[in-house]
Amino acid sequence: MLGQYGRFRKQVPLATLDAWIGQLEGWREIDTTCQSNFTAKEVLAAWDAWQLFLVDLSQRETIQHRRASLVLLVKPVRDSDDDRLISTALANVERLKHEGDKLITKAISWVLREAIKRHRDAVAAYVAEHESTLPAIAVREFYKKYRTGKK
């Protein structure tokens, strides 16, 4: 529904989105709600609020909020070269990289891979510097996409 009604999506307060995220179960519901629904243009238009929201999500006790802190950035980092987006994405990765739950490790891999399109040098430098502390699957999938262009 969020994807089909952009005009209404822009009117959804972040507090409402936060409440919705808190009701989600599993990766499919989180990803359907958070990935590709919010564009870089929309996020950047209200950057101060979004940046605080994304950082806050990454520090929550609930795993669905922590996953959302990464998944909400997948489309924006893929579609915009704005440094604020990749900086926030990498800061959230840094906060969450020690978690072993697949919901987080796969989200880390996803946001790193999608960032290659617009932030190739920055994300490659980050992965090279933090390779030993990032989830192994994220490093493996990142380098495959980086080298071949394919997942």
Residue ranges of model-derived segments:
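Alpha-helical scaffold domains
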Residues: 1-151
